[in-house]
Design a protein with these regions (language model features):
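Active-site phosphate-binding strand-loop segment of PLP-dependent enzymes
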Residues: 30-102
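PLP-dependent aminotransferase class I/II
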Residues: 117-193
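A short helix-loop-beta submotif of the ANL/AMP-binding
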Residues: 20-26
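Conserved PLP-anchoring active-site segment centered on the Schiff-base-forming lysine
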Residues: 1-18
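Hydrophobic/aromatic ligand-binding patch that stacks against planar heteroaromatic rings
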Residues: 16-17, 80, 110
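A short helix->loop->beta-strand "cap" motif at the edges of active sites that frequently abuts
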Residues: 23, 83-87, 115-116
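Short beta->alpha connector loops at strand-helix junctions that form conserved
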Residues: 8, 27-32
Length: 193
């Protein structure tokens, strides 16, 4: 089957999703140096050049490493993937939970090419503690990609969302900013101690 690049350690559901789609995980292991995870770009370049690698599941910010990838790091990933025809699925579900001194950069914001050769997955489930409502957004600029996503979620019957979930999503994003800022202060306080 086709190969999907993942940067380990990573959220365990990535692996079951890859297997369930008949694909094989290709590992770009993150390096752990002096208490910080970094990307092995030489290894990423080598693995992305394999014609059987079709997709990269990018976790940005990274879970569980806690790294908020810099714009420069993301630009290197984009360059490697674009040159090798590797499509990027950016799991950016933790994007609202960034501590002071770090800046989250959406992968799709890097360039027009990155926008058209990626999809972004976000959800209020982590930042607003709404995992139980099981709702997320998949953002794709390319019309053909949106059609493929629509077919895939309908085949897997994950498209039916209850009305409570929609209301919760709208309330979280529309009225939850004050609560989210308080949560981030609380979490950062725990992190500092």
């Amino acid at each position: 089957g086709d190969k999907v690049l993942v940067q380990t350690p990573v959220y365990n559901c990535f692996f079951s999703s890859i297997r369930n789609d008949g694909c094989v995980a290709e590992y770009n292991h993150l390096r752990y140096e002096d208490g910080v995870y970094t990307i092995d770009f030489e290894d990423l370049e080598c693995k992305a050049a394999d014609p059987s690698v079709k997709l990269m599941l990018l976790c940005n910010p990274h879970n569980p490493a806690g790294r908020v990838w810099s714009r420069e790091e993301l630009e290197k990933i984009a360059d490697i993937c674009l040159r090798n025809g590797v499509f990027v699925v950016a799991d950016e579900i933790h994007c609202e939970l960034v501590y002071p001194g770090h800046r989250y950069t959406p992968f799709a914001s890097l360039s027009e090419e990155a926008l058209l050769h990626s999809v972004t997955c976000i959800s209020p489930s982590k930042a607003f503690n709404l995992a139980g409502i099981q709702i997320a957004n998949i953002v794709a600029a390319d019309e053909e990609v949106r059609k493929k996503i629509d077919r895939a979620i309908n085949v897997n019957e994950v498209c039916d969302v209850n009305s409570f979930a929609v209301d919760a999503l709208v309330a979280a994003y529309g009225e939850g900013e004050e609560w989210l800022e308080e949560l981030k202060r609380y979490l950062y306080g725990n992190y500092e101690t």
